[in-house]
Amino acid sequence: MADKLHILLLNGPNLNMLGTREPDKYGTLTLTEIVNRLNAEADALNVTLDHLQSNAEYALIDRIHQAKDTVDYILINPAAFTHTSVAIRDALLAVSIPFIEIHLSNVHAREPFRQHSYLSDIAAGVICGFGADGYSYALQTAVKRLSQSH
């Protein structure tokens, strides 16, 4: 059996409130439900999926640093840090791990301050506006890209 791919899923601030936080924008699934669904998909794809949700920028940065040389791909929903965090951008650049930026809502159809991302220009791609399905699309894309590069 081939070595398992190792993918890190990161979720930023307030995503722990999914299911009750503005369900018209973010859907009714909780983060636990989304991650459980994604774990089942990852298992079927022979992928190890690690997950961290944090409201603290430093915790996400520390986990990105720890991923160096151990993680093949990062899936990140930076949430509000999308629009503010040069530090997360720098951490992602420092580890040189390809990543996909995920957003539940279509950030380009939201308020002007939500339309700028400090991560999009360095991401392998951005998936937004497809709700929880965006996580699945990101996982499938990461696995496909990794299998093409090996």
UniProtKB/Swiss-Prot annotation:
GO-annotated biological processes: amino acid biosynthetic process; aromatic amino acid family biosynthetic process; chorismate biosynthetic process; quinate catabolic process
InterPro entries to which the protein is assigned, alphabetical: DHquinase_II (IPR001874), DHquinase_II_CS (IPR018509), DHquinase_II_sf (IPR036441)
Top EC class for this record: lyase
Site (Transition state stabilizer): 21
Catalytic activity: 3-dehydroquinate = 3-dehydroshikimate + H2O
UniProt: substrate binding residues: 77, 83, 90, 104-105, 114
Signal peptide (from-to): none
Record note on quaternary structure: Homododecamer.
PANTHER family the UniProt entry points to: CATABOLIC 3-DEHYDROQUINASE
Protein's name according to its UniProt entry: 3-dehydroquinate dehydratase
Organism name: Citrobacter koseri (strain ATCC BAA-895 / CDC 4225-83 / SGSC4696)
